[in-house]
Amino acid sequence: MIVKSANAQLREFYGVQFQVLAIGQNSMVCKMLYRKTDSVPAHAHPNEQSGYVISGKYKLKFGNNNQILEAGDSYAIPENVEHSFEILEAGEVVDVFTPIRQDYL
């Protein structure tokens, strides 16, 4: 699957806008477009989530982790682990979900 940036559809979940950039057999790549007013409450899903911060500043909480993330930082959250994401400064994050998040389609 190839998605040209001009063709990436804007979607929304928890009030956060995002684009699905690619869907493979077992994983998907999304670009999250966080606004300062966005908030991702504590939740869990059956997908492993790995992310890379392109821009912005965030507070990520999961397990015993409570970290501030900025451009260049990355993270991995195991499946079924409750986590939350507080937006401190607007920006973009690339997230990879394995398996594919059906609720994002």
Task: Pin down the residues of each PLM region.
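A short, N-terminal "cap"/entry segment at the start of jelly-roll beta-barrel domains
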Residues: 1-26
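Short beta-strand segments in beta-sandwich/barrel cores
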Residues: 39-40, 56-61
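Glycine- and acidic-residue-biased ligand/ion/polar-headgroup-sensing regions
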Residues: 47-58
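Ligand-binding loop in jelly-roll beta-barrel domains
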Residues: 79-103
